[in-house]
Amino acid sequence: MRYAIIADIHANLAALMAVLTDITKREEIGGVWCLGDIIGYGPDPRQCIELLRRTNHICVAGNHDLAAIGEIDTSDFNPDAAAACEWTAKQLTAQDRVYLKGLPLVIEKDDFTLAHGSPRQPIWEYILSISTARENFAYFKSKFCLVSHSHVPVIFKYGKTGSCSFSQFSTNKELVLGEERLIINPGAVGQPRDGDPRASYAIYDSETKKIKLYRVPYDIAATQARMVEQRLPLRLVGRLSHGI
């Protein structure tokens, strides 16, 4: 069975639609695994929640998902993120809030552990360095862990001797899952930060034991126009053009 792995949609409906359309063009998908932050930053939180809920999916909670419903404090958010969160909170329906509040922090699925930030601190921790990755391997029992939060597609590998290495998860690269334990980040659908503005997602094939990363162009200008219309911070608008 094949599963689509998506993350950090961030209320970017045009990007989510482009990714879901791209997924349907490929072989049959058994479901969608979402790594959180469905909302925040972007202009269409309700629509993204609704569209995701129409798919056969599982999803963990992200920090923006919980912040928008008052489950976590936004004092650590930068001013633009906090402003977008405040706006997002006003857009959500009661049904949206119930759905978001019900999202688990961690999901174990097959050989994978799913978390938004890290298995050690699912909501807040970024896995950006080899040292942080090495420490986190002790916090999940499965062979592989899927994370997001940094919006950058990367792979951390834990060797048998306790060593840890890092590599970029390149577009169209097939990652063969073997005996080595891995922490894998598929990048972001709605706000990439690796210098490539295209939406990012991956597909896992449970039969071949491979994960492949894909990039999908979408109508960035349409999302930006919606953000300006909703008076969201201009810095958030501009960064979509550059994938930063």
What do the PLM-derived regions correspond to, one by one?
Residues 160-244:
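Acidic, His/Gly-rich catalytic cores of divalent-metal-dependent hydrolytic chemistry
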